[in-house]
Amino acid sequence: FKPAPENPILSQRHLPAERPFKVDWAGHADLVEGPDGQYYGVFLAIRPNEENRVNTGRETFILPVDWSGTFPVFKGGLEPIQPKLAMPQGVKNETGKNGYFPNGNFTFTETFTGSSLDYRWVGVRGAREGFISTTAEGLTITPYETNIKAVLPTSTLFYRQQHLNFTATTTLKYVPRTEKDLAGITCYQSEKFNYVFGVTKKAEDSYIVLQRTEKGESSTIASEKIEGNTPISLRVTAEGDKYTFSYSVKDNNYQTVGGTVSGDILSTNVAGGFTGAMIGLYATTSNDAEAL
């Protein structure tokens, strides 16, 4: 390869760190010819939050490329990249259709009553169908004995975090039999970096617990005694780096558990790697999130 004399042709490193709607770490581009005969560069970049942490991982961007000379040059490759870019002429926008992921602001509701799962739901280290079944009443999870920190298949059903700001809610019908039983939700970067927010048991009572795991070491942030034998709604809300976990047993009156916590352990800056965090449904019979 012969380096281009105009290098770099795609970079954000020279731009002010505090610029609004920042897109950063641009690179790893593929050059393609579009249906309009114009060249484009499809590349990876990230959208950091207000703490400059990356919880959504690498994402795909596109810019037009001028290849009229000897070397390709990205049009706008040294300018602040915008989170939303124009579609190439002749390309049909099928965002959110026919197996393509949705983009931008949207809501997604899953009842789990269909015969098959939406393609957006993913498992870890094993087929998702190994521990779930869909019924007329919703999803049933038959929990594995493995804990979420195990490097083994776990009974977790995930949806990738796509937004810096989001709310995810689920309603749970569950009665733990022992302190080793837990079911709820998780925000997950890896087996070593995650939050678990779920229902478990202490003595004869049911509790909602919030557990934080960093570098494989877990601690219970907070817990609250709750009514047993009652459906419970669990919710996680993120505003950039700030995450809150809450629950409701009636009338959508949500109570926060553990206050506002940092999403630092869900970022690639802290946990490593390049993929974003996931929000998931989780159940286990090897729980170690103890009620306080």
Predicted regions and their residues:
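Carbohydrate-active catalytic/glycan-binding domains of CAZyme proteins
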Residues: 1-292
